[in-house]
Amino acid sequence: MLKGKTVVLGVTGSIAAYKIANLASMLVKKHANVHVIMTENACNFINPITFETLTGNKCLVDTFDRNFQFNVEHVSLAKLADIFLVAPASADVIGKIANGIADDMLTTTIMACKCPKLISPAMNTNMFTNPIVQDNLKKLEHYGYEIIQPDSGYLACGDTGAGKMPSEQVLLNYILRTIAKDKDMTGIKLTVTAGPTREKLDPVRFLSNNSTGKMGYAIAKMAMLRGADVTLISGKVSLEPVPFVKIVDIVSAEDMYNAVIKSAKDADIIIKAAAVADYRPSYVSDEKIKKKDGDMSIPLERTKDIIGTLGSSKRDGLFLCGFSMETEHMLDNSKVKLTKKNLDMIVANNVKVAGAGFGTDTNVVTVITKDAVEELPMMSKEEVADALLDRIMKARQ
């Protein structure tokens, strides 16, 4: 995902410095070209050799090191960088950058950078809330730096409060959001549904399906990385939340209907990837239904047709994409649904095909519009999501 991208990590003197070794490793695994610049104080917390081993690049500390790779190293690395993250960022280095003081390799390099720059403060709570530090952070924001707010919790000094550097995964998420994809969806409001619904039978039982939400979550993630303003309406799943998106948790088909209709009011694109129940029990027992001799019949009633409602009153400028999971007659059934529901696109797959369906990390889909039918090869669900977004963006032109 970061192949061909250069990430510069600036590490300052903080006990949290050791965590950046893991971040560097995570970035390398995503095929980024990672360079680390350390302050002299940072070397008291972690050895530069650690970063050199993990990244395969020399860790820079001394501005006047004669064994450099580039002619003017801080300038050439600044030109090479696609993103510069200072983490952990001490109060000292924050103050220097905010006030134009460039007296070491880290500060001189970041001053020469024109790429996106992120600052992740990490320090004692009283230091972080100090008006001088806060003024410096506001000044950096004014100059286009993005400040990653610290977490609150138990700090190395023994205090509890704000000042804790976020996890490596959070820092990685910020980097991915900034440079992983071209921002061709900036300004677009996209709503995607994901996961199953649960239709209550009694206080302990419900009717549901095997949807894990992986496809919908992949769509939300890739749209976010491409700059879209994403609303993810999700049933009960066991997936990590997608960062930087609005998540609306629902349980039943009725919940899903209400959430989608509300979100549709200002959406540009709606992708219905959730597996919504077509039927629900006509009666919900207030008490647990007891086992008795003989069989039991449960009367069912239709739930509201969410995408049908959207299609019947579709306004100009709204792009509607549905999903159709079938076990037989996939193309015929999906084409009927495309027309009947007044959709712009439908994504069909057969749950019986290997690599497709619920719970897998891959999918095999056929993209159907009024004018074309396109079979896509087996891909990861993130790759499928990207391919779908490509086709939606092209169709909207």
Name what the model sees in each region.
Residues 1-118, 124-213, 217-397:
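A cross-family phosphate/adenosyl-ligand binding-site feature
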